[in-house]
Design a protein with these regions (language model features):
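Catalytic histidine-centered segment of alpha/beta-hydrolase-like enzymes
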Residues: 299-312
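Active-site pre-Tyr helix/loop in NAD(P)-dependent dehydrogenases
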Residues: 54, 148, 302
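Flexible "cap/lid" subdomain of the alpha/beta-hydrolase fold that forms the substrate-access gate
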Residues: 2-29, 36-39, 47, 76, ...
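Short, hydrophobic alpha-helical segments
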Residues: 318-326
């Protein structure tokens, strides 16, 4: 899509990235013998759950945590099972509903929150929508960006949206990763037979695969983001959601077939080449109580990192308005 005339060379400097060890990493058993790793800062504030996607870990939120804590929120930033510092699944169980149940167990059962605000993009956005519907009354409000929109197909057709145009579920010019990670993971894993090659595969998604706005991620940023993916088992865990479209079994289907009625702040990164601008039209239909979609120039798929200067204050204002009512 891009914003015509926007010069990314003039994009403001973004907040400094905290050191890799800037935040304490907690580990909690979520009741099934599996431990999730997470950052928890600002305890006592209104709770916000930040859910990463792929090829991400909790590190994608590093530029957001301090600002949201300073704004008065309790910020909970987990690694999904199999990702980052969280445990791998001994049963190789990785699917969207499992992620949803894991995070509910962490935030509700372990940390004791009866309700929460949720922020998610990519896989994290889909998990967030499932949580809205699956755990009624738990999610007060949502921030949703750059992911697969809810699949309210009849409503989209009625609104004149061409279902075939939804890029997030299509195979675009840089979309071979979907086929390879989903349909031939063993072949791909055999090719990526060293930590360096595995990191290079992920690094391309922060660079030449055009997920991000040009120049957003420095070499140091990419090193930081790819380090957790050097391990083959963790990279394979990240691929699991893509395999759901190629016959991988899931215990349950996520609840994505209905509109979202909770207050929702919507963003879209204008330079995203994974999720297309059809996302805007879909969100205007699927979210009945929305702010946005707000299109961010100079940002792509990882907009919380790429335009933290806009994301942090906007998210803070939105969730302050929610917290004042609950």
């Amino acid at each position: 899509m891009s914003v015509t005339g926007y010069d990314v060379r003039l994009r403001p400097a973004q907040p400094a990235t905290p050191a890799a060890d800037a935040f304490m990493i907690h580990h909690s058993d979520i009741g099934n013998g599996l431990e999730l790793a997470y950052v928890r800062e600002g305890v006592g504030g209104y709770p916000l759950l930040l859910i990463h996607g792929y090829p991400e870990t909790k590190r994608i939120w590093w530029r957001n945590i301090e600002a949201l804590v300073a704004a008065g929120f309790e910020v909970i930033v987990p690694d999904l099972r199999g990702h980052g510092d969280s445990d791998l699944s001994e049963s190789d169980t990785y699917d969207l509903v499992t992620y949803s149940r894991d995070l509910y167990a962490l935030v509700h059962d372990v940390l004791g929150h009866e309700h929460v605000g949720v922020i998610g993009g990519d896989v994290g956005g889909v998990v967030a929508v499932d949580m809205v519907h699956r755990f009624e009354g738990f999610v007060d409000a949502l921030c949703f960006f750059d992911t697969v929109p809810p699949m309210v197909i009849d409503a989209y057709v009625a609104a004149g949206i061409d279902i075939g145009s939804i890029k997030a579920i299509a195979d675009g010019p840089t979309g071979d990763y979907r086929r390879r990670q989903g349909g031939e993971p063993d072949v791909l894993a055999a090719e990526l037979n060293s930590p360096a090659l595995r990191r290079a595969w992920v690094a391309a998604m922060y660079g030449p695969r055009l997920w991000a706005s040009p120049g957003t991620f420095s070499d140091a940023d990419i090193d930081f983001m790819t380090e957790p993916w050097a391990d083959e088992a963790r990279l394979r865990a990240g691929w699991a959601v893509y395999q759901l479209g190629y016959g991988r079994a899931a215990e349950e289907f996520p609840i994505l077939d209905r509109a979202v009625d909770v207050p929702t702040l919507l963003f879209y990164g204008a330079d995203d080449q994974v999720v297309g601008p059809d996302f805007l039209h879909c969100c205007e239909v699927a979210f009945t109580n929305r702010v946005g979609p707000l299109v961010l120039a100079g940002a792509g798929h990882f907009l919380q990192w790429e335009r933290a200067d806009i994301f942090n204050p906007t998210v803070s204002m939105f969730f302050h308005s929610i917290a004042s009512k609950v």
